[in-house]
Amino acid sequence: EFIDASFKENIGDPNKINLEFVIKEFEKEYLAKVNVFGNNITEEKVIRDNLEVDEGDPFNKILLMKSINNLKALNIFGKVDYNVTPTSDNDKKKILNITIEEKPTGEISASAGTGTSGGTFGFGIKENNFLGKNISLDSNLRIDEETIRGKFSVVNPNWNYSDRALIASIESSVTDRMGDYGYKTSQTGFSFGSNWEQYDDLYFSPKIAMFHEKLDTNQSASNKLKKQEGDYLDADF
């Protein structure tokens, strides 16, 4: 639609704000071409998938601004600029030039602490734009006096260009309390899910998780723990 919208606010009474929305039709113009510059790492497909406007569409300022905001919301660009120019042969046809500035998307974190239960050490590596496809990878490891826990997760926000996110993770943990309480537990498993907007502001997030858990005990364990000793398979949906 060839419309533009704006609003004016008028503060008359201290406790009231009057908003005036102005919607007007402007001259018919079309988007002839979209150019993308500065994406040395990010695939152009990632950028164009987040645009609300495309070549051949009616030129709409509202959708243009929404497109720019979509790119900024990806959080993989340090700067997003644009300009609109007419074509050389027709003022009614526009060329959209988008210039992005990519920023470092990898993160390394480390943590250490101590308390009444002993010391804790953590380490993590995260990448928010793997292979330039806007895929997030996250791995972390945490170690304390009794427990070792590790997790690796992948998030693809537009799996197979379906507008649906693919979320997968693998994790494992071992808690050894044989010396103090007579038991040791280990848990290993994975989760697999998706997320998408079915209707306006209505999202579906199905997820399945399966874990194998093992409990070992010795003679110093409580009778309750001894009865629970063995292997278990848990599944959640």
PLM features per residue range, with description:
Residues E1, E52, K72-I76:
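Sec-exported extracytoplasmic/periplasmic mature domains
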Residues E1-S6, V80:
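Phosphate-interacting basic helix/loop segments used at nucleotide- and nucleic-acid interfaces
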Residues D4-K61, T87-G122, S162-R164:
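Periplasmic POTRA and POTRA-like interaction domains that precede
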Residues N60-F237:
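Gram-negative/organellar outer-membrane beta-barrel architecture
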